[in-house]
From Swiss-Prot:
One of its GO terms (molecular function) is zinc ion binding. This is RING-H2 finger protein ATL74. A zinc finger (RING-type) spans 105-147. It comes from Arabidopsis thaliana (Mouse-ear cress). It is found in: Membrane. Pathway: Protein modification; protein ubiquitination. SMART domains: RING (SM00184).
């Protein structure tokens, strides 16, 4: 039916081999090529989304981590117990018994006052107000400044 309309629109003075059917064939080829291209793009999109989902699931489940690294990240999320907190040294700011390089607590951003009790973390020597760092270490097991794990220090120091 479509071909009849095309031939009648042309006026009928064209010969059958001169191109009356060529435009129709060209349109059909263009439509078929467009469908193939769109189908290939859709398949590529679905494949990419599937691979992304698989990778995210694998990372979430921890397949990308070794067993020791996975244990370390779980331990870093857990805090320290109160009796472990008491093992960290406490110094009096300004007394000169322990050299404290910092002048302010990195947690509350308050300056240390002379005579104030400051807790010094052994592996990195960062200093904090006792109340600030104790609150932090109840829910974390790393230094808030440098993220150095404090669990390794206790394991090595307790033996």
């Amino acid at each position: 039916m479509h071909r009849l309309l095309l031939e009648s629109h042309g006026g009928g003075n064209e010969t059958s081999g001169s191109g009356g059917g060529d435009g129709y064939t060209r349109d059909m080829n263009f439509d078929a090529n467009m469908v193939i291209i769109l189908a290939a793009l859709l398949c590529a999109l679905i494949l990419a989304l599937g691979l992304n989902s698989i990778l995210r699931c694998a990372m979430r489940c921890g397949f990308g981590l070794s067993s020791s690294a996975a244990a370390g990240t779980v331990a870093d999320r857990a805090g320290l117990k109160k009796r472990e907190l008491k093992k960290f040294p406490v110094a009096e700011y300004g007394s000169g018994e322990v050299k404290i390089a910092a002048t302010e607590c990195a947690i509350c951003l308050g300056e240390f006052a002379d005579g104030e009790r400051v807790r010094v973390l052994p592996p990195c020597n960062h200093s904090f107000h006792m109340s600030c760092i104790d609150t932090w270490l109840v829910s974390h097991s790393s230094c808030p400044n440098c993220r150095h794990s404090l669990i390794e220090v206790h394991v090595a120091g307790s033996e």
